[in-house]
């Protein structure tokens, strides 16, 4: 079973995340941030990864700590669930359309955390959610999942559509990259014999 549960508690947030990489896309998300919950629901649905997130944070200040800390915990959960990464497909990429928006997302489950994020949002907020937090979440996730992740919105006019295309794009590449490659015979997909470093 490729599952993991991460609990993270700081003075700012208390978070519990559970993932099942071989799930059906079921989700149970409660962060107290409506738009963010919507994005995480999409992530679960389109990745086919079961995701449970329970987060209590200092939302009376702003959404930054909760958003970032959920990214940290979810990244850690995915990394833990992958184990030694034997047999995974490892690489995946997609061009993901969302109406007038087109975003390219490419992933390498490399064990070498890197984020290249190029998306410009026409507005500073989507509802009450600061659009700059989209990048913050992706950075926290990539650094803690140990993945190389490139996210680039090629064009788009609607901030909601841009954010949604980024999350859906990540979902689809995660789905492909964590999948077991039947031809790999359980081998780690690296000439080094291990991933990371």
Curated annotation (Swiss-Prot):
GO terms for molecular function: imidazoleglycerol-phosphate dehydratase activity. The keyword Amino-acid biosynthesis applies. Gene3D superfamilies: Imidazole glycerol phosphate dehydratase, domain 1. It catalyses: D-erythro-1-(imidazol-4-yl)glycerol 3-phosphate = 3-(imidazol-4-yl)-2-oxopropyl phosphate + H2O. CDD domains: IGPD. Its EC number is 4.2.1.19. Signal peptide: none annotated. SUPFAM superfamilies: Ribosomal protein S5 domain 2-like. InterPro entries: IGPD_sf, ImidazoleglycerolP_deHydtase, ImidazoleglycerP_deHydtase_CS, Ribosomal_Su5_D2-typ_SF. The keyword S-adenosyl-L-methionine does not apply. Keywords: Amino-acid biosynthesis, Cytoplasm, Histidine biosynthesis, Lyase. It is found in: Cytoplasm. One of its GO terms (cellular component) is cytoplasm. It holds the Pfam family IGPD. Belongs to the imidazoleglycerol-phosphate dehydratase family. This is Imidazoleglycerol-phosphate dehydratase. The gene is hisB.
